[in-house]
Amino acid sequence: MNKVVLLCRPGFEKECAAEITDKAGQREIFGFARVKENAGYVIYECYQPDDGDKLIRELPFSSLIFARQWFVVGELLQHLPPEDRITPIVDMLQGVVEKGGELRVEVADTNESKELLKFCRKFTVPLRAALRDAGVLANYETPKRPVVHVFFIAPGCCYTGYSYSNNNSPFYMGIPRLKFPAEAPSRSTLKLEEAFHVFIPADEWDERLANGMWAVDLGACPGGWTYQLVKRNMWVYSVDNGPMAQSLMDTGQVTWLREDGFKFRPTRSNISWMVCDMVEKPAKVAALMAQWLVNGWCRETIFNLKLPMKKRYEEVSHNLAYIQAQLDEHGINAQIQARQLYHDREEVTVHVRRIWAAVGGRRDER
């Protein structure tokens, strides 16, 4: 199995391909990407037979920006007989995976695949039973074993393979299923909620998204992102010349500051979170975020970088490298992650967490 399938947002296949080619090459795993425009997936074909497994084992999935999910696969199965689609799939997976922990029968996130998705859901139950009988799947679901993927690209036409549960997306098709809260002021609220799911482990939410924290929302109007912070019982400074939703102001947790987000400077020294979703050039936003982090004005930040029409991967990489360089220059240790979320459009969402000193009095504990 020398191919890796990467699911992505339709229209961003070139960026996904450029990224995996770059990051696989850095680890001396060489190959080439097969790209079909608006297909919603990319296939990276490695030159060496075992390099597909090596890639999904060694390259951290969290380091990828444009991939929603990935898994290693073998050759394409075509012309599956309608009377028995199961046997060829079982035969393909036997000897490749033993006692997998979960089965996901998936498609790309395109309009053309929606009809196929209905079939996948029905097909999952009998296929799971057959894979358990064959020993490909364990008799019970477990997150400690590899995930078995069956990826349909057309009726009767699929790739089969696996991913490692400690280095993949935990979500079906790489998409968290979130429901829009009726009381939220705008649909952008789902971007921040998804970012929390993607960037912050579930067992750390109570500590890192805690009641009573102080937060700042730059470019807050009408309050889609502020809503997520208020929902978690934080106190929020919402910075924007535009008005905030009255429902948020009525909570008593929001202080509306009619200022330009680029000029605002916090007066508190205990701000845990700064979030920012402003329509501005990515370099300008990156510079502002670096300033907040270098000065210790917040512990963690989630922000969006709007993408240009061309060279999107290069632009994002350049801005992330700039932030990293600023942090390095000032001796600040931090974790940086970026992802094009399901609820993002022409943008990527970035999370930066300062690793604060254990010893009091350090300059990064101001």
Curated annotation (Swiss-Prot):
Keyword Zinc-finger: no
Class of this enzyme: transferase
MF GO annotations: S-adenosylmethionine-dependent methyltransferase activity
Residues annotated as binding S-adenosyl-L-methionine: 188, 221-224, 240, 260, 277
Example GO biological process: rRNA processing
One Pfam family recorded for the sequence: RLMM_N
Compartments it resides in: Cytoplasm
Catalysis: reaction(s): cytidine(2498) in 23S rRNA + S-adenosyl-L-methionine = 2'-O-methylcytidine(2498) in 23S rRNA + S-adenosyl-L-homocysteine + H(+)
InterPro entries for the chain: RlmM_FDX, RlmM_THUMP-like, RNA_MeTrfase_FtsJ_dom, rRNA_MeTrfase_M, SAM-dependent_MTases_sf
Residue numbers annotated as active site: 306
Cellular component per GO, a single term: cytoplasm
Enzyme Commission code: 2.1.1.186
Primary site of residence: cytoplasm
UniProt keyword terms in alphabetical order: Cytoplasm, Methyltransferase, rRNA processing, S-adenosyl-L-methionine, Transferase
Family, per entry: Belongs to the class I-like SAM-binding methyltransferase superfamily. RNA methyltransferase RlmE family. RlmM subfamily.
Subunit text: Monomer.
Function, as annotated: Catalyzes the 2'-O-methylation at nucleotide C2498 in 23S rRNA.
Record-linked NCBIfam families: PRK11760.1 (NF008734)
Name of the protein described by the UniProt record: Ribosomal RNA large subunit methyltransferase M
Organism listed in the record: Shigella sonnei (strain Ss046)
Lineage of the organism: Bacteria, Pseudomonadati, Pseudomonadota, Gammaproteobacteria, Enterobacterales
